[in-house]
Regions:
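Bacterial Sec-dependent N-terminal signal peptides
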Residues: 1-25
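Non-catalytic interaction/Regulatory regions outside core domains
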Residues: 19-168
């Protein structure tokens, strides 16, 4: 069983990204950069405000999650989570990788977006693995931090410090 897990993790680490320069920091945390034209794509399509870091909370594919993360569509708990963090200079959005469920989400939420042109799925290969969520933070230079799976307040603060050039 241990060998199967090790093989899965090795394959997962090779498949987590496509079209981005990426380094693996730990089992589920990645850092890297995307080119300027991809930053421009994000600003154009996801209401990324000038002078801010973009925080993206992903709800991944139903097929990659052992539970239905779309059962609860309301994200009030997530809004409260970010409000308590009191982060400055951030644009916070949510991406649904399930297009057929997106219509339900966008009726009540203006900060939910589709994965336009499969940008995130193709660039970061979020179809791989068995996870329900992913968290990404990107600065305007294109440097990013990505955590696949569950995340904590500490992850968000660490990502923010790293992208500002500080040590967490």
């Amino acid at each position: 069983m241990k060998n199967i897990v090790v093989i899965f993790l090795v394959l997962f680490s090779f498949s987590i990204v496509g079209h981005a320069q990426v380094d693996r920091r730990s089992e589920f945390v990645f850092e890297g950069s995307i080119p300027e034209h991809k930053v421009a794509f994000l600003k154009q399509n996801y209401n990324w405000k000038e002078g801010t870091k973009l925080i993206i909370t992903f709800k991944t594919f139903l097929s990659t999650c052992p539970r239905n993360q779309y059962r609860v569509i309301d994200n009030d708990w997530n809004d409260e989570f970010y409000r308590k963090l009191a982060l400055k200079n951030v644009t916070n959005i949510y991406i649904s990788l399930e297009d057929n469920l997106l219509r339900k989400l966008t009726k009540s939420r203006k900060d939910f977006y589709e994965d336009k042109d499969d940008f995130f799925t193709k660039t970061f290969n979020l179809k791989s693995g068995r996870h329900c969520y992913a968290l990404m933070m990107i600065n305007e230079k294109g440097s990013f931090m990505l955590r696949v799976g569950e995340y904590t307040e500490a992850d968000i603060f660490d990502f923010s410090k790293i992208l500002e050039g500080e040590q967490p």
